[in-house]
UniProtKB/Swiss-Prot annotation:
It is an enzyme of class 3 (hydrolase). Belongs to the protein-tyrosine phosphatase family. Non-receptor class dual specificity subfamily. Residues 20-137 form the Rhodanese domain. The lineage of its organism: Eukaryota, Metazoa, Chordata, Craniata, Vertebrata. It catalyses: O-phospho-L-tyrosyl-[protein] + H2O = L-tyrosyl-[protein] + phosphate; O-phospho-L-seryl-[protein] + H2O = L-seryl-[protein] + phosphate; O-phospho-L-threonyl-[protein] + H2O = L-threonyl-[protein] + phosphate. This is Dual specificity protein phosphatase 1.
Length: 367
């Protein structure tokens, strides 16, 4: 398989893109989060779950490498002269893990996409971005908006939600999670100047008492849950994810907020990343925390996210064990997740010293 794959360095790929960009398909085999932080312009992210990888047993089908049917059809029809595979920094394809994304993608392309020449990018994205930064798209991390755009607070923000006028917990402004998804507090949601500066077209209000200040200007989705251990936020995951996707598909941007932008709204953003990108909770948590450092979903919400993870990543697991939000997900086997997260809700215990639980939390979601 390796003998069928050519090698390009950064200069070679630059020349290829300059001559035949429309006939060159770039497949980035890094994680979703690495790809989102920066990638070669026009490249496509290749990713699949560990369950799919395990089932493949070293022979991944092209439908998993290029899941977009139209793109895959063009590839099989010979519309692409070259397909270039890359990871973060590998110097040679033969050094890639046999069950890794890069090797599995190369194998599938060599077996099924015979009309195109397959290449491996030596040095990966790291080398190419250093040599040709103008051909790469990068997201600044964290990306936020500074607070003092104006000192006035709308009249509508002075009642119904006390935090709107006292953002003492805020560290900076709203943050970009994805190009179409932003996270922040009720105070940010009361600042039309901030929302307009970010290009926001819709808001998800994850609270029972914070008002929707500008219903004549933006589309709103209300999720009336409290930030406590009794609240079932997972039953709203599907609706929230569908709403975000509908705004994204319409070319809009969604701002998700609760009162403080710490627990409820962060939980919705985490669920969105986990479901749409099939990543584990700890990966999604680290990704969001890098952008808004004060996030801290309460202990119950973390448990609901873990249940969500077990069913998102394990398609054989019994969906009946999860919340209503999981009814349409695949089923799979259970997984064990170990992580360290701060939690902000009091934990009821006979020992009063344990008024707040600090991890590590070890959880084995069960089917």
């Amino acid at each position: 398989m390796v003998m069928e794959v050519g090698t390009l360095d950064a200069g070679g790929l630059r020349a290829l893109l300059g001559e035949r960009a429309a006939q060159c398909l770039l497949l980035d085999c890094r994680s979703f989060f690495a790809f989102n932080a920066g990638h070669i312009a026009g490249s496509v992210n290749v990713r699949f779950s560990t369950i799919v990888r395990r089932r493949a047993k070293g022979a991944m089908g092209l439908e998993h490498i290029v899941p977009n049917a139209e793109l895959r059809g063009r590839l099989l029809a010979g519309a692409y002269h070259a397909v270039v595979l890359l990871d973060e920094r590998s110097a040679a394809l033969d050094g890639a893990k046999r069950d890794g994304t890069l090797a599995l993608a190369a194998g599938a392309l060599c077996r099924e996409a015979r009309a195109a020449q397959v290449f491996f990018l030596k040095g990966g994205y790291e080398a190419f971005s250093a040599s040709c930064p103008e051909l790469c798209s990068k997201q600044s991390t964290p990306m936020g908006l500074s607070l003092p755009l104006s000192t006035s607070v709308p009249d509508s923000a002075e009642s119904g939600c006390s935090s709107c006028s006292t953002p003492l917990y805020d560290q900076g402004g709203p943050v970009e999670i994805l190009p179409f998804l932003y996270l922040g507090s009720a105070y940010h949601a009361s600042r039309k100047d901030m929302l307009d500066a970010l290009g926001i077209t819709a808001l998800i209000n994850v609270s029972a008492n914070c008002p929707n200040h500008f219903e004549g200007h933006y589309q709103y989705k209300s999720i009336p849950v409290e930030d406590n251990h009794k609240a079932d936020i997972s039953s709203w995951f599907n609706e929230a994810i569908d709403f975000i996707d509908s705004i994204k598909n319409a070319g809009g941007r969604v701002f998700v907020h609760c009162q403080a932008g710490i627990s409820r709204s962060a939980t919705i953003c985490l669920a969105y990343l986990m479901r749409t990108n099939r990543v584990k909770l700890d990966e999604a948590f680290e990704f969001v925390k890098q952008r808004r450092s004060i996030i801290s979903p309460n202990f119950s919400f973390m448990g609901q996210l873990l249940q969500f993870e077990s069913q998102v990543l394990a398609p054989h697991c019994s969906a009946e064990a999860g919340s209503p939000a999981m009814a349409v997900l695949d089923r799979g086997t259970s997984t064990t997740t170990v992580f360290n997260f701060p939690v902000s809700i009091p934990v009821h215990s006979t020992n009063s010293a344990l008024s707040y639980l600090q991890s590590p939390i070890t959880t084995s979601p069960s089917c």
